[in-house]
């Protein structure tokens, strides 16, 4: 391998412009592929076979309106006073403008909806009063009737059907039960200064285009109402389609500055960054060109972007650093490039191989979006490796001795010396250092035992974002659970009449209302064939809280009694339930992924180094690092320790697929630096001997 890479590096250096043109052609083809196929990304996190996904498919076929995407617009008075009639009219105009947006099916006027709720409650109250008055009159009439004459006979003589009265009484009781289950459900706050409007889209939630969401916000903002503020929920305001954000750009800039300071020359500082950016561009374009052929999430290319930047800079820097050392010893430029690729390049090759194994192994989880994310990230690492072995030598050849600081370019060759008497403290006492580091990592890992997984809601958004403000206002004025309603799907027996089906729905609704952490149970909807019903449940707690997760489990546990007593089956659907299912499945798959990756990569390192100690040290180091990292993440983002330093204002569950991705990335980096460190553990004199052996220094 070292001889092959030596020849590859030297050949690339000799034909520098040809190599550069080839890579520019590859980039052009990749960009052309994206231009031809287009970019088709989705925010959907779907796992085939889960209950929520099966129910979503069922609703899409049987009750399309129940599967429509929705978003909420929160209106509020800026001074906290009640809405005036002029403000209500202005809000109505803004909502009507929203209905003209392509992709919007309808909007719900909160004031009309609240009036309907209030009227319904008032009608029930009036009906109850009339019923009580009628019962009193009936009792008085019964006392005054002669013997042998019943009240029913008198009612019939007056043209009143007694059976109809009983039916009206039953309907009244059903209405009262329905409103009792609804509790204090409102869409306009009790103090009349906050209101929630629902925007119904024509597409399902995860298929709503970002342009449609933006157009909704623009339409509302184009009709400002004096004294009224407006915020948009996460379903409308969130957009995660940007592949490069401020953090990535800042990271590249900081990396460039660090390289400039350490290398003390502009050319060597720019070279690793340039190759990394080219690698990310090629890999990302190739990935996006396939987005029309496979279901691809918006975040799928992001892992490749982050890893591509990291390893692209690292790999190129390893070769560059070896090349600079050899130039200082007087080795000719192209010969030095070949030797650098043959030595450091060999370490980079096997390091990249282990990283790719760790990433591609994400497919063993059986979770499509995670496997695809790992595969595309593996592609980014592969491109970074190929660039390091070909383009980096070409650029080094063109740079010549300018990769050295000016003072060193014409200096006499010299050997690097090692002061054997000035050994660092941690090397003089290796066992103490090892045990101390292990103890610190173990302590950091302790919080990982209480890790709870989930998918983020709007509470993690920036405090000045519209989706965070909407989330908080809804929670304060309408209850935390209003941010994450749960859809309960009821499978009914065949052949039921509408009344019989509604009775089954009422029984299920009563069971749901009796569960802990339930705030409101809204009236159920039936399909035309009365085979399926949908009931919306609003929890007391927020969508990412543990109590909501327990509620979903409690609802599913109702099936035992409901199936035996009512011959119905209930399932839980909706975004909140889907997030819970995805998180649970990812948590179950994490140990499997960890075990498979460690086993495969351990075998790879055993074959590469033909040693047991080096792979074992690398594996144990990774394991401790991974557990400590997970523990630190839990302490900060779930417990809130030091949250102010990291911008954590609302601690909550850990992003469900973060531990799996973190394990993959940390393992890749651990196995990345271990081969490089081991390859570089040689004295300068040994390196010179290696020059004539055509092999890496060991």
PLM regions: where:
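Membrane-embedded transmembrane helical bundles of large multi-pass transporters/channels
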Residues: 1-39, 44, 201-453, 567-568, ...
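Structured non-transmembrane domains adjacent to transmembrane bundles in polytopic membrane proteins
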Residues: 52-56, 60-67, 84-229, 450-639
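A detector of helix-start/N-cap boundary segments at the beginnings of structured domains
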Residues: 42-46, 184-185
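Alpha-helical transmembrane segments
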Residues: 39-40, 47, 54-59
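Short active-site-adjacent helix-start/loop capping segments
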Residues: 79-83, 116-117, 239-241
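Short, compositionally biased low-complexity segments
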Residues: 26-32, 66-70, 190-194, 445-446
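Acidic/histidine-rich, surface-exposed loop or edge segments in extracytoplasmic proteins
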Residues: 71-78
